[in-house]
Regions:
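Solvent-exposed serine/threonine-rich low-complexity stretches and specific carbohydrate-binding patches
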Residues: 52-59
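Surface beta-strand/loop "capping" patches
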Residues: 2-30
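Polar, glycine-rich mid-to-C-terminal structural blocks
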Residues: 19-47
Length: 347
C-alpha cells in the first residue's frame, strides 16, 4: 500500500462454470502483489446472486473459489461488491455490458457506488467504448435518487462527453429533462450546471442565452448570482460575436464590490480576441497577479477551454515551466490547481 500505483484485478468464471478465478498483477511490471480481502458478486441468469469472498495473501497472484451453483451462459461478475477493494478492477466485455445494464435495477447503494467507480475506471482505461458507456449511463442517471451517487455519475458522464465524444445532443436532452422534471431541487441544479458546461448545439446555447439575458431560471431550479456569472463566461466563449455585450451586461448586474473586482479580473480570459487572451496569460505568469489564486485558476481555466484548445496549446509549456516559481510563491495546493486549470478542459 505504500508503493505507487495499484494492482490490476480481474475476476472471471472458469470455462467449466464451477469456480471464480481471480488474479492480480502489477501494471508497472515490478512484480508487486497486494495482500487484501476482496468481494465479488456472481449474478445468475435467473436473477439469483452469490457473494464470493476472496483473500489474497502475501506473494499470491491468483485465487480460485468454487461456486455453490453451476454458472451458465448469461452469468456475469460484479467486482468489488462491498467497495472496500483497492485496485483497478478490469471488466470483461460481457461483464461490463451487464454491469452497465443492471445499474438502474441495483438496489444496494454501496454496490451501485462501487460499480460506478469500476465502470468509470474501465472507461478511462479504454476497456469500455465511450458510446456504450454514455448510452447506459444516460438510461441510469434519471433513476438515481441518492444525491452522492447522482453527483458522482453526473461528473463521470460530463467527463466522458468532454474527453471522448463529439456530439452532446442526447446528453443535452437528458440533462434538460432532469433540470425541468427531477423531484429533488438539488438534482435540478446539478444537472443545470453540467448542462451549462457541455452545451454545444445551437438550440442548447440559445436556450442558455435566453435564460441568462432574462435572468429567468427554469422552474424549480434556483440559480445564484455565481451561476449567472459562470454562465456568462460560457456564453461569451460560445458566442464570440456577443461576448463583449455579455461581459458588459454581467459586469453591470454585479453589485458586490469584491465580486465586481473578481469579474473584472477573470472576464478578459473569455475575450474573443486572441491578443487579449495572450495578454491575460502573460499577466498570470507574474507572481503579483496570482495573489488571489482562485481568480488566477479560473482565468487560466477559461483560457484553456476545450473550444479554444488549438489556440491554447501555446500556453501549456510556459505554464508548466512556471510551476517551480508557483510552488515557491503560492499556497501549497496552488500548483495542483494551476495544472488542473491548465489541462483539465483540454482533450
Amino acid at each position: 500500500m505504500n508503493e505507487k500505483g495499484m494492482p490490476e484485478i480481474c475476476g472471471v468464471i472458469s470455462e467449466d462454470g464451477k469456480s471464480l478465478q481471480v488474479s492480480q498483477k502489477d501494471p508497472l511490471g515490478r512484480g508487486l502483489l497486494w495482500e487484501q480481502d476482496l468481494s465479488f458478486l456472481v449474478v445468475y441468469p435467473d436473477g439469483g446472486t452469490e457473494d464470493v469472498q476472496v483473500s489474497f495473501g502475501k506473494e499470491q497472484a491468483s485465487c480460485l473459489k468454487e461456486l455453490k451453483r453451476q454458472a451458465s451462459e448469461g452469468c456475469f461478475v460484479m467486482p468489488n461488491a462491498d467497495g472496500k477493494g483497492y485496485g483497478f478492477f478490469r471488466l470483461l466485455e460481457k461483464d461490463a455490458k451487464a454491469c452497465l445494464g443492471n445499474l438502474p435495477a441495483c438496489k444496494d447503494e454501496v454496490l451501485r457506488g462501487s460499480l460506478l467507480i469500476t465502470l468509470y475506471e474501465n472507461l478511462l482505461n479504454r476497456t469500455i467504448p465511450a458510446e456504450l458507456y454514455m448510452e447506459a449511463m444516460l438510461d441510469y442517471l434519471p433513476t438515481e435518487n441518492n444525491s452522492l451517487l447522482f453527483s458522482a455519475a453526473l461528473g463521470y458522464i460530463g467527463n466522458c462527453q468532454r474527453f471522448y465524444l463529439a456530439d452532446p445532443e442526447k446528453l443535452e436532452l437528458v440533462l434538460w429533462r432532469i433540470v425541468t422534471m427531477a423531484e429533488q431541487s438539488q438534482q435540478r441544479l446539478q444537472a443545470f450546471r453540467q448542462y451549462r458546461s457541455i452545451a454545444r448545439s445551437p438550440e442548447a446555447v440559445g436556450k442558455l442565452y435566453a435564460l441568462w439575458k432574462d435572468q429567468k431560471a427554469p422552474a424549480g431550479c434556483s440559480l445564484s448570482e455565481n451561476d449567472y456569472i459562470s454562465l456568462s463566461y460560457d456564453l461569451a466563449i460560445q458566442m464570440p460575436d456577443k461576448a463583449d455585450e455579455i461581459v458588459a451586461t454581467q459586469q453591470a448586474r454585479i453589485t458586490n464590490p469584491d465580486r465586481k473586482r473578481q469579474y473584472a479580473f477573470i472576464s478578459p480570459s473569455v475575450s474573443p480576441r486572441q491578443e487579449v487572451r495572450d495578454s491575460v496569460f502573460a499577466s498570470l505568469l507574474v507572481a503579483e497577479n496570482r495573489r488571489v489564486e482562485p481568480w488566477a485558476s479560473a482565468a487560466l481555466s477559461n483560457l484553456n477551454c476545450q473550444l479554444r484548445q488549438k489556440e491554447a496549446v501555446g500556453y501549456i509549456r510556459p505554464a508548466l515551466e512556471a510551476l517551480q516559481e508557483i510552488q515557491r510563491t503560492g499556497d501549497i495546493f496552488f500548483p495542483r490547481d494551476w495544472v488542473r486549470a491548465l489541462l483539465s478542459r483540454l482533450t
